[in-house]
Amino acid sequence: MSILIKNGHVIYGENLDVVRADVLIESNRIVSVERNINEAADTVIDATGRVVSPGFINLHTHSPMGLLRGLADDLPLMEWLQNHIWPREAKLTPEYVKVGAYLGALEMIRSGTTTFLDMYFHMDKVAEAVLDAGLRGYLSYGMIDLGDPDRTEKELKEALREMEAIEKLNSERVHFVFGPHAPYTCSIALLKEVRKLASEHNKLITIHVSETMAEIGQITERYGKSPVVLLDDIGFLGNDVIIAHGVWLDSRDIQILARHGVTVAHNPGSNMKLASGVMPLEKLLNAGVNIGLGTDGSASNNNLDMLEEMKLAALLHKVHNLDPTIADARTVFRMATQNGAKALRLNAGIIKEGYLADIAIINFNRPHLRPINDVISHLVYSANGNDVETTIVDGKILMLDGEVLTLDEEKVISEAEKVSEKLA
């Protein structure tokens, strides 16, 4: 299978050079980026007036939570979770989660996301949806034991069961990740065992850390130290760890994260909506910490649009620091592409020969994207997910000219509505 993308504005290489060029894809790799490629291809896409971008990498989400979108808004995090989200999640069956995963996958395909790091439950069912949709999914079962030893054993058993189920799929696009929920919901015993298992099985770890001031207070009262120091003291951290949020980090925390090569997944939309706080982006970047971008779940955002998330990230840090030079467009664009790929150890996030063919083609023949003075600026400040026209993952076209090819869109939406009624 080969694809030739003709006449596009291509965002090329690590430096984000915008060049007028063609892109040739063979199998699942980009093999050539140059002008006037004349080789025959199975599919030819005319990208005149379009931007050919790396696909976006959502480094923290809970994709099935689209089922809960709009059910509880304008509330503090713990009230939102305990009184509204967790009670409804208790009603979720494996099949309901799968329906939610299809809805999330459809939304991501439509907005140019090609890879996502997910945390939820019944992840073997999510994996089935990811395979059908054609996306790349890094899937973690969210483990919570609340200090109960019996529950610790149960959670570890379930994580290993889901790991085995996902590995049996034998797909290069679907990967299991260990996902202890957070230091305030997980015992030290659980965290230590996760660290051991991740090393044994060569898996990544993702965990919510320092999201709210309430969490900081709870952990400090319980252990006499910050969540990051706690994780460092028990030997949990490493360059295979991706922490979500990292809002309330002091200078010591930041140095610890930098020393271990930990990635932080920034979720500006969710952090603003839940009034959690503002991640110290500049301090983290200056310390050399890898920062990716995530939407969080679409019940706390309330969508999975990475183009919108880039704009939120850029604007949040400018106004918070009263400095318009902070979180410039190129820095934020890298967070949504290259940096996410680095965290996932994925040869993607860049359009260049030899890289995986994970691509979003954005239609710039729109009034809000003209004139084309600066492509990266337009993507960060002017574009939105509805401008994405074609999505390619692993050399396969998932959406072409606005038509999703891998999923029955009407069926996905109809099934989601039916499940939502049962959860209300």
From Swiss-Prot:
Zn(2+) binds at H60, H62, H208, D296. It catalyses: S-adenosyl-L-homocysteine + H2O + H(+) = S-inosyl-L-homocysteine + NH4(+); S-methyl-5'-thioadenosine + H2O + H(+) = S-methyl-5'-thioinosine + NH4(+). Its EC number is 3.5.4.28, 3.5.4.31. InterPro entries: Amidohydro-rel, Deaminase_MtaD/DadD, Metal-dep_hydrolase_composite, Metal_Hydrolase, MTA/SAH_deaminase. It holds the Pfam family Amidohydro_1. Its cofactor is Zn(2+). Binds 1 zinc ion per subunit. GO terms for molecular function: 5'-methylthioadenosine deaminase activity; metal ion binding; S-adenosylhomocysteine deaminase activity. Gene3D superfamilies: Metal-dependent hydrolases, Urease, subunit C, domain 1. Keywords: Hydrolase, Metal-binding, Zinc. Substrate binds at E89, H181, E211, D296. Transmembrane segments: none annotated. Catalyzes the deamination of 5-methylthioadenosine and S-adenosyl-L-homocysteine into 5-methylthioinosine and S-inosyl-L-homocysteine, respectively. Is also able to deaminate adenosine. Belongs to the metallo-dependent hydrolases superfamily. MTA/SAH deaminase family. This is 5-methylthioadenosine/S-adenosylhomocysteine deaminase. The gene is mtaD.
